[in-house]
């Protein structure tokens, strides 16, 4: 049975050129910190890759630190910036809709005397009026808000967030989890993280790279404290011998995710949603935030629990998810609940992640499988 894969928001279908680069670069074994010619060659590969990833961010190469992925990048930024900016206050502001690597790190900081304030995020977009109120009433060291929600794709306007912060005169720093939004926003918004944030995190395997590689953007002139010790690699921010093959593959994936790929994903999304509404009618609920990335959307089959739908879809070779993969073992979807969707929707929620490597034919099979899951529930009622 062939696999029809629409869980690209958990881990995307690999970019073939990126896999090719990974395979070739894995043969280059010299340590990039070594001073002989082989080591210097490996170092050049990393720096060339850094330039390509920086181009995706629209920033300078020296602002990019390579990590093991989005979770490490978020941990490094949230903990590091809170510590660095402790003089401004002890309050970290975020939302319950954030990725677990942000929420858990913020809560862990409470053991060090920090306070976590969760502002509302209806529909996955933070309440900026509440943010303003907190900034005016508390001593905030860090605001951390994702650019694109990993459950429904809702996009947060980082320019407006920065505007609220500037208007209050806060000394807080701003971090954004850009794992889902990186390369997936229109050109006019592609540089927002660099223009308005002090740091931003991304992950290679969400854009067609390989797992185990990510990057952290850090504003020029801002010294990010290291999360670990034991080496001076990556400007001292991330010690340890670099994952050369993963880094080079990430750069290749960045180079192959552009306007054409975004346009294809947008067309596939529209096709799937139109097909679902035409064929399932009132039996499907689809969330479409006013401003969103096209690579994912959240939906529910009415009166079909997520696990029932997932089991049926898996039996016919279709892969989707019901939540962020990093929180898939949780009994409830805290992120969706915090966004105001309600318990009934939450129990039936499915996340569809679309890749430029998906096809229209696969979209037809996805819709047919979802239709089959609904019929399976009705038949077994």
For the regions a language model picked out, list residue spans one by one:
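Pyridoxal 5′-phosphate
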Residues: 1-381
């Amino acid at each position: 049975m062939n696999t029809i894969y629409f869980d690209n928001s958990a881990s995307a279908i690999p970019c073939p050129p990126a896999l090719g680069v990974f395979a070739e670069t894995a043969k280059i074994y010299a340590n990039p910190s070594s001073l002989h010619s082989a080591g210097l060659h490996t170092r050049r590969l990393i720096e060339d890759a850094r330039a390509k990833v920086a181009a995706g961010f629209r920033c300078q190469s020296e602002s990019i630190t390579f990590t093991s992925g989005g979770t490490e990048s978020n941990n490094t930024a949230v903990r590091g910036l809170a510590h660095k900016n402790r003089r401004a206050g002890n309050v970290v502001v975020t939302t319950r809709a954030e990725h677990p690597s942000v929420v858990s790190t913020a809560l862990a900081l409470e053991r060090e005397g920090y306070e976590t304030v969760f502002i509302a995020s209806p529909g996955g977009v933070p309440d900026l009026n509440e943010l303003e109120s907190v900034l005016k009433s508390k001593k905030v060291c860090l605001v951390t808000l994702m650019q694109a929600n990993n459950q429904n794709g809702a996009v947060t306007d980082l320019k407006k967030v920065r505007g609220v912060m500037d208007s209050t005169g806060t000394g807080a720093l701003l971090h954004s989890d850009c794992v889902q939004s990186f390369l997936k926003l229109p050109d006019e918004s592609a540089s927002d993280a660099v223009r308005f944030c002090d740091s931003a995190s991304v992950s290679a395997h969400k854009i067609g790279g390989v797992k185990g590689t990510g990057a952290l953007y850090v504003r020029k002139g801002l010294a990010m404290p290291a999360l670990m010790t034991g080496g001076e690699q990556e400007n001292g921010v991330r010690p340890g011998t670099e994952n050369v093959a993963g880094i080079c593959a990430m750069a290749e994936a960045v180079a192959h995710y552009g306007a054409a790929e975004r346009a294809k994903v947008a067309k596939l999304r529209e096709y799937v949603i139109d097909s679902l509404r035409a064929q399932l009618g009132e039996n499907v609920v689809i969330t479409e935030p006013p401003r969103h990335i096209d690579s994912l959307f959240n939906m529910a089959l009415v009166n079909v629990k997520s696990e029932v739908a997932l089991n049926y879809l898996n039996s016919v070779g279709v892969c989707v998810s019901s939540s962020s993969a990093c929180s898939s073992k949780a009994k409830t979807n805290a992120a969706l609940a915090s966004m105001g969707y309600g318990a009934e929707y939450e129990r039936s929620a499915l996340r569809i992640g679309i890749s430029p490597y998906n096809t229209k034919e696969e979209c037809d099979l996805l819709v047919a499988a979802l239709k089959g899951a609904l019929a399976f529930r009705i038949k077994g009622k």
